[in-house]
């Protein structure tokens, strides 16, 4: 559906997430740098009357909108999932490559283009040794039900990727910030 361009990326887009915000669609994607080493987030936009064809999408930035900078993110930010809350977008994302360990972070944006991490620490860490997610808690997906409750679905494993499990937790909100019980 979309092919990013520019010197900042390798020309591929994976892990797509589409959301409607401020009168248009935003397509968030993961891409890598030219050396295929660092994975980061990019964004494209389309009008609300799109047929979701490739030619309907316009790259919204000529650089990454979220790049791995925190130690726990390693060389990778991927698997973004977006939830709208109080006229803001919250991006839950996987930091670090699978089983490095991968953990979940959160960033916030008021315009869909400029993002700020809510913390330099993971929102959801991998589990302790012996727990079901000791190798990874990653690839988040957010779901908001008809009652307005938000749920975080994510994958994990404790054997460095030989098996995978998926679980969910309700995301609670206080003062514009998400938290887990």
Regions found by a protein language model. Give the residues of each.
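Carbohydrate-active catalytic/glycan-binding domains of CAZyme proteins
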Residues: 1-181
């Amino acid at each position: 559906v979309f092919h990013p361009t520019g010197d900042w990326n390798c020309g591929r887009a994976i892990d797509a997430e589409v959301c409607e915000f401020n009168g248009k669609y935003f397509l968030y994607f993961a891409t890598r740098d030219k050396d295929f080493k660092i994975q980061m987030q990019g964004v494209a936009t389309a009008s609300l009357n799109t047929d979701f064809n490739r030619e309907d999408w316009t790259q919204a930035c000529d650089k990454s909108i979220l790049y791995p900078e925190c130690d726990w993110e390693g060389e990778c930010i991927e698997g973004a999932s977006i939830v709208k809350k109080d006229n803001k977008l919250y991006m839950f994302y996987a930091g670090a490559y699978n089983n490095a360990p991968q953990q979940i972070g959160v960033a916030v944006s008021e315009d869909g283009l400029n993002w700020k991490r809510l913390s330099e620490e993971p929102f959801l860490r991998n589990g302790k040794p012996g727990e079901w997610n000791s190798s990874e808690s990653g690839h988040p997906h957010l779901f908001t039900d008809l009652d307005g409750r938000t749920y975080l679905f994510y994958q994990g494993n404790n054997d460095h990727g030989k098996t995978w499990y998926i679980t969910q937790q309700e995301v609670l909100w206080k003062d514009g910030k998400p938290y887990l019980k």
